[in-house]
């Protein structure tokens, strides 16, 4: 009983500290200096997939023809990317942010860089969102001009939400 009570208190304190850290991160201004912007295209789309091995996807060299759009689209596919960490949150933190001495600088991320360069930014997610800045990735998302989460609550909030529903948000 004592250990359970102690664990509850410790875990609760860790959650509170993480929420305070996320709120602090949300207020930090980016430090990007953009010297020139010469976009080749009017629209850029970045699709971030997770929890899928590239050898299971045809567009990335897999043996199955299961990615017809990605296999035929006129775009750049990073087929040799290796996750920066074993967990999604840490990997995306190291991938989407500027990293200094091995630590992600959450205020300097690819969304704030695009904003600073004058692009209009949108973030669509099929992940859950518990609070405004519940994770470091949500704090990146919230820096976009337009932000839409399909799910409210944790990532299991509505397991039946299909990625295709993200397309409805673009109409």
Task: Please state what every model-predicted region is.
Residues 2-46, 51-171:
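Active-site-proximal alpha/beta segments of enzymes that process anionic O-linked groups
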